[in-house]
Curated annotation (Swiss-Prot):
The UniProt record lists the keyword Transmembrane helix: no
Protein name: ATP-dependent helicase/nuclease subunit A
Gene Ontology CC annotation, any one: DNA helicase complex
Domain (UvrD-like helicase C-terminal): residue spans on this chain: 524-810
Source species of the chain: Streptococcus pyogenes serotype M28 (strain MGAS6180)
Length: 1222
């Protein structure tokens, strides 16, 4: 029971323990350290759980128990008197929110079982019941709640929907873009706009490249806290700032000088090699050595004296001098080994080459950028207007609305800040600036709890910015008064073999330049238990490389996908694990960088009978055969003269016309017509008036008649029925749904067809009607090279898992294979014609006409694409950001493993040393080398080569073709089947007899205790009421639903576009209103309207509430005035829980419910319940709800040990409020 009231009706105050002081936390840490528990909490975990009263940033390494810490902290808050609904808990995914809620629920149940204090049990039970309504979820979900409740304050209806289908978004975007593009092409600044379009698309007819530019700018702006302000103030920031050589950032100059000095140092190391050949046979310096010494000396001098010799203004001159000094090639050869000494410097020189010329023309592109800024701003506003009109928004819109509500309404913002005791965020490293702004508005400035790991920030494509986490980390370390940093380093997931190789790799690879964090001692993984440190020699990490000196010929042509030989290596290792060590398939996971080009893995595994479950691939729903057949069927129904669709339908299994049939039909041309469609030829063939009627034999004629009859019925039905019903009619008429069940991948095919019907139904429910619009929408999706989400089907559990690294985040697996390690990182974005940056704005490649510079007179123009200075700055930052994220992806992949990690790739064994750098600089790989290497494999090989004297905890092994023969790979061992002829130990009949006896006993028990079996553990008064209804009918008591049935069964057609309001929703809204209504004020229409804004219901439901009737209850009835007179004794919407005994099974069960209102006096209780049911006579409702009110009265009497002297029903379903005493 949840009433915290004593026997006299006075509230009981639970004495909660205070929050722990720093000294108490230290004492607890010491006690934990000295305890004899098998699994102890670490000192840092204890600190993270119990520290309070300030902002806290928890940097939790992989496997360090961050979820455990969050759950324990939440439970501790609850035990210290903080209600669960006063905690804001943000998770990255809906799944994570569900799991967190379940863990909290289990903890509360456990705590209730352990607690002996009755009042604490009541309090914890209240928390358990409030858990479902607590703010535990994604930022998107919370933003929707804010907008649903307060959207009216910024003019947004609470009746909105989320556009989750990218195809629908693209269709609306295309409509807005086309209209806006036409307007700009006819405006006053049209010549500048045309130049802008030509700069990206080449001509004004093909606008696809320009459209992509606009869409990308729009999407990028949506991840900022205020898109409009960002577009107005930051979009052209770099274009305005970087216009001269002096404007180049110092950091970029430092990187160039560092590359020059590194090149000099590397060249010196090469010249010092024993086999280099410094001297000729005569003993004098060799020409090569003299030349290299000159390069070393000049590069060192220019770096040392850069400011006095050149400075920023002379940067262009420095680039020319260095270019003329060093050789054009990258390598220096010593004893037939090539060392790429000059490669990095050449890349840097390329970045700065032609700066003077670029800056000369860069100013010409500024008017184009201003036009682009105007267009994107106009597009953003127009697109939003369309979405407001449709009342359909993207998630980013809803979050921006929520930010606007909190920024513009001080009272709403303060109410949230006062309400939340703490603002908790999981996966903080993946927040974007929009989400960060929302969190800042919800916090009071000193109550944030953020958990994350910057080393696992891998969602840059969602505009996540790890620098948000990084900045907080730096700020809190420099200024502890702003917040506290707690490091969770202990890993409780992986064996030492995995931890050691992870530390070895990333201590040589990751720092703030690449990776965004220095992987030093405070970030290294430490085993959390002694069991993890027990060594297993066979679990040492392996880098297995297929030797590509002799290519197997099975690799994809673009060499980006995984090859057959690499997959065979994996299959061989899995067979060995399964056969020799008994590792179940489900303990093995394959991780890949992307979902595409993985079919070869499934195909190869099938050859070796290894079961595999894939995470899916490219979205090809609309391109699946069965869906294409149905879409062409719908196209034909919409327009039979569409020859392509018609032929596809005729050739489909539904009608099975072959090539010969189609050829005969095609010859039925009307010679008088120039153009004749296939549908007309079919009609002429049926009536025998084609050019060659003799070709139409009886069998073909019969097929044509069936086809035309079926098509006619479908076309007629399409005009009257829904799309959903039409699709199912097609399935049933031609048995197509059943047909695909007999084909390969039958389950997937049927799921796809079923989903097509559901999507058509969803399409019509969203306000779009008709077959034509549906077909048009699908075609637009295909035109934009998009697709609809694939349909998932059930997968086997005992199988190897194949998933992307992104999908694996947060999961763990005993054995992990990281595949395709030789795949180059995608650098597509840094080669686009534009690059966006949050601080700098946009940088573009400008198509300049350099005819005047060249003095050309014969050509009309000489166009050259130039990388403007803002573009180069953004490009460098984007390159480093991409490499940093790839490094973090590798960290995530490696730390998923519990026992062993494998790296799989391919490389040329004879060339494997070419990538290495001969200079060892400290503990890290040289920055220039890390920037130069573009695969996981290259990083690992470079570390293995340069730090070969260390134990790196992984071995490199090349696999030859001879290792991958059928005999070498082997086969899975299958268990020995029982020999049916061997009856020596066959006791089958005895076993069956015993099983039958057991089944009979179980059946008898089930029969004896049937009532108890079907008895729910928890029941509600409404359920009991429903159970009594069948018993009331035979004795002449009418059930209200039956007595109030309309006399006519005819249903009038519903033409109104208004949303139908359910009676149950009105009832819920009335109860909410009666709960929040302030009784200390006079009850009038204004009071009721003010209270109405506070309830969580949509506008249609609020409008349906009869406020005059509610006002009449309080003003015109004695009970309503009783409410106002004795409001201090009034309890509203009070939950209760009592133990009952089922009369049939004699088993106990819990009865839970919520009492609308009751008045608690010293010697008695008055019970009130509101009803909105429609009725003819009040006696009907009195009989219907008598049992329910008796249960309420019993609960109150058990709780307070006082009689319930009066029970009232307040009936709001009639013409006026009526009071019935029960």
């Amino acid at each position: 029971m949840l009433f915290n009231i004593n026997e006299k009706g006075e509230p009981l105050v639970i004495s909660f323990a205070p929050f722990l002081s720093p000294e108490a936390i230290k004492h607890l840490q010491e006690n934990e350290r000295c305890s004899d528990q098998s699994q102890k909490r670490t000192a840092q975990q204890i600190e993270a759980i119990y520290t309070s009263g300030q902002n806290i940033l928890v940097s939790a390494s992989a496997g360090s128990g961050k979820t455990f810490v969050m759950v324990e902290r939440i439970l501790d808050k609850i035990l210290r008197g903080v209600s669960i609904d006063r905690l804001f808990i943000s998770t990255f995914t809906v799944k994570a929110a569900t799991e967190l809620r379940e863990r909290i629920e289990n903890k509360l149940y456990s705590q209730i079982a352990q607690t002996t204090d009755f009042q604490m049990k009541v309090y914890l039970t209240e928390q358990l019941q409030s858990l479902g309504q607590a703010d535990i979820g994604t930022m998107d979900a919370f933003a929707q709640k804010v907008v649903s409740r307060y959207g009216y304050s910024i003019g947004i209806s609470s009746q909105f929907r989320i556009m989750q289908d990218k195809a629908e978004q693209d269709v609306l975007k295309q409509e807005v873009f086309s209209k806006l593009f036409s307007e700009f092409m006819n405006q006053k600044e049209a010549p500048v706009f045309r130049a802008l379009v030509k700069n990206f698309s080449g001509n004004c007819k093909d606008t696809s490249a320009f459209r992509e530019l606009v869409y990308t700018c729009y999407s990028f702006s949506q991840s900022t806290e205020n898109p409009k302000i960002w577009l107005q103030e930051n979009f052209l920031s770099a274009a305005k700032t970087y216009q001269r050589l002096e404007d180049i950032p110092d950091h970029d100059i430092e990187l160039l000088l560092l590359a020059m000095q590194d090149t000099a140092n590397q060249l010196r190391d090469v010249t010092d090699m024993e086999d280099y050949g410094q001297l000729t046979k005569a003993g004098s310096r060799s020409a090569k050595y003299t030349k290299h010494l000159t390069i070393i000396e000049k590069l060192s001098d220019w770096v040392r004296d850069f400011k006095c010799l050149y400075g920023k203004a002379g940067l262009d001159r420095l680039i020319r001098d260095v270019t003329g000094l060093i050789p054009s090639g990258n390598d220096v050869t010593v004893s037939k080994v090539k060392y790429p000494v000059f490669k990095t410097l050449h890349q840097k020189l390329k970045q700065f080459r032609h700066l003077e010329t670029i800056l000369m023309y860069q100013k010409d592109c500024f008017p184009l950028l201003e036009q682009l800024q105007d267009f994107v701003l106009a597009f953003s506003e127009a697109y939003l207007a369309v979405k407001i009109q449709e009342s359909a928004f993207e998630f980013s819109d809803i979050t921006h609305f929520a930010i606007k509500i909190l920024e513009e309404n001080t009272d709403i913002r303060q109410s949230y800040q006062q309400h939340y005791h703490e603002v908790m965020v999981d996966e903080y490293q993946d927040n974007n600036h929009m989400q960060e702004r929302l969190l800042t508005l919800l916090s009071n400035g000193h109550n944030r709890f953020m958990v994350g790991d910057i080393k696992q920030s891998i969602y840059r494509f969602r505009q996540a910015d790890p620098q948000i986490f990084n900045q907080k980390f730096r700020d809190y370390q420099k200024k502890p008064e702003q917040g506290k940093v707690i490091l969770l380093k202990e890993n409780f997931r992986s064996q030492s073999e995995v931890l050691n190789v992870s530390n070895a790799v990333f201590s040589h690879l990751m720092d703030e330049s690449v990776g965004d964090v220095l992987y030093d001692e405070q970030h290294q993984l430490i085993a959390g238990s002694h069991a993890q440190t027990v060594p297993y020699l066979d679990r040492r990490a392996q880098l297995l490389l297929y030797n590509s000196d002799k290519d197997d010929g099975n690799a994809p042509s673009d060499s980006e996908g995984i090859s057959f030989s690499e997959v065979t290596i994996v299959a061989k290792e899995i067979i060995k694990l399964h056969n020799d060590k008994g590792v179940p398939f489900e303990d093995i996971t394959l991780l890949v960088s992307s979902r595409t080009r993985n079919d070869i893995i499934s195909h190869t595994f099938n050859q070796y009978s290894i079961p595999i479950v894939t995470d899916g691939g490219q979205q090809n729903y609309l391109k699946s055969v069965e869906v294409m057949v149905m879409l062409d069927t719908l196209r034909t129904i919409n327009n039979p003269r569409n020859d392509y669709a018609l032929v596809a339908l005729l050739r489909s299994p539904m009608f099975a016309f072959d090539e010969d049939d189609l050829a005969r039909i095609a010859l039925q041309k009307d010679n008088e017509l120039d153009k004749d469609c296939l549908y007309d030829k079919i009609q002429r063939a049926v009536i025998g008036r084609g050019a060659h009627p003799e070709l139409i034999h009886d069998t073909l004629l019969g097929k044509l008649n069936i086809f035309l009859k079926t098509l006619k019925s479908w076309r007629r039905y399409a005009k009257l029925g829904s799309l959903y019903d039409l699709i199912w009619k097609i399935f049933n008429d031609r048995f197509y749904f059943d047909f695909v069940a007999s084909q390969a991948k039958a389950e997937q095919a049927q799921a796809n067809l079923y989903a097509l019907a559901l999507r058509a139904n969803q399409f019509e429910k969203s306000g779009y009607k008709g077959l034509y619009r549906f077909i048009k929408m699908i075609d637009k999706v295909l035109e934009t090279q998009n697709d609809l989400a694939d349909v998932e089907v059930a997968a086997p559990k005992q199988a190897v898992n194949l998933m992307t690294i992104h999908k694996s985040k947060g999961l763990q697996f005993p054995y992990v294979f990281i595949l395709n390690c030789d795949k180059r990182f995608s650098m597509t974005d840094i080669h686009k014609s534009f690059i966006l940056n949050r601080q700098h704005g946009i940088g573009i490649k400008y198509l300049a006409d350099i005819k005047g510079l060249l003095g050309e007179t014969t050509l009309n123009s000489v166009k050259v694409s130039m990388e403007t200075l803002p573009y180069q700055l953004n490009k460098q930052e984007l390159r480093l950001a991409t490499l940093s994220e790839q490094m973090r992806l590798l960290y995530v992949a490696m730390t998923r493993a519990e026992k062993k990690v494998y790296f799989i790739g391919k490389a040329s064994k004879s060339k494997s040393q070419d990538i290495t750098d001969p200079k060892k600089l400290g503990k890290l790989l040289p920055l220039a080398l890390r920037e130069q290497l573009l695969t996981f494999q290259d990083w690992l090989l470079a570390i293995a080569d340069i730090f070969s004297t260390e134990d790196l905890y992984f071995d490199v092994r090349f696999i030859e073709d001879s290792d991958l023969t059928q005999e070498s790979v082997g086969r899975l061992q299958t268990p020995q089947l029982l020999n049916p002829d061997d009856l020596k130990d066959n006791r089958q009949s005895e076993t069956i007899a015993r099983a039958l006896d057991m089944l009979e006993a179980v059946s008898q028990l089930n029969a004896n205790y049937e009532a108890a079996i079907h008895l729910p553990t928890v029941r509600t008064p409404s359920q009991l009421k429903a159970a009594y209804e069948p018993l009331l009918e035979p004795i002449g008591v009418d059930i209200i639903e039956k007595s109030s049935r309309s006399l006519s069964d005819f249903t009038l057609p519903h033409f109104s576009k208004k949303v139908k309001v359910e009676a149950s929703h009105i009832g819920s809204a009335l109860h909410q209103l009666m709960q929040v209504l302030p009784l200390s004020k006079p009850i009038n229409q204004q009071t009721l309207l003010d209270a109405l804004r506070e309830i969580d219901s949509n506008e249609e439901v609020k409008t349906a509430l009869d406020l005059k009737k509610i006002e009449s209850f309080f003003c015109d009835t004695s009970l309503g005035q009783f409410f106002q007179t004795y409001q201090k004794h009034l309890y509203r919407e009070a939950p209760f829980a009592i133990l009952k005994v089922d009369p049939i099974s004699q088993e106990e069960y819990v009865l839970r419910g919520i009492i609308d209102a009751y008045f608690l006096f010293d010697d008695h209780i008055v019970l009130v319940d509101y009803k909105t049911d429609k009725y003819k006579q009040p006696i009907e409702l009195k009989k219907r709800y008598q049992q329910q009110l008796e249960l309420y009265a019993e609960a109150l009497t058990q709780t307070y040990k006082l009689p319930v002297t009066k029970r009232y029903l307040v009936l709001m379903g009639g013409g006026k409020p009526e009071i019935v005493e029960v």
